[in-house]
Amino acid sequence: MAAHKKSHIRIFFVSVMIILSLFSGFGEGQTYINYNGMKGDIIPGCSSKNPKECVKIPAYSYNRGCEISTRCQRQQHSSSS
């Protein structure tokens, strides 16, 4: 009786492994990057008909600000030759 029960368990596990191996191939992705994936940085509306939309605004424009030591006054550097 124990040998008969072990054979049922063995058949069950083999059938589960076969089913899982069949389903494992369905989720595979593409093996290459297509051109649609590389177009993510294109600005919509940027074309030769509308060139002003192609200009990107810088993310950080440097501003030195006010220094306490100069009391917010810029010193004029004279160039002596």
Curated annotation (Swiss-Prot):
UniProt keyword annotations, A-Z: Disulfide bond, Hormone, Secreted, Signal
UniProt GO cellular component terms: apoplast
Segments crossing the lipid bilayer: none
Keyword Signal: yes
InterPro entries (alphabetical): RALF
One Pfam short name: RALF
Lineage: superkingdom: Eukaryota
A biological process from GO: regulation of growth
Signal peptide: 1-29
Intracellular or extracellular location(s): Secreted
Principal localisation: secreted
Coiled coil (residue ranges): none
One Gene Ontology term of the molecular function aspect: hormone activity
Disulfides per UniProt: 46-54, 66-72
Family: Belongs to the plant rapid alkalinization factor (RALF) family.
Function: Cell signaling peptide that may regulate plant stress, growth, and development. Mediates a rapid alkalinization of extracellular space by mediating a transient increase in the cytoplasmic Ca(2+) concentration leading to a calcium-dependent signaling events through a cell surface receptor and a concomitant activation of some intracellular mitogen-activated protein kinases.
Protein name: Protein RALF-like 6
Record organism: Arabidopsis thaliana (Mouse-ear cress)
Lineage: Eukaryota, Viridiplantae, Streptophyta, Embryophyta, Tracheophyta
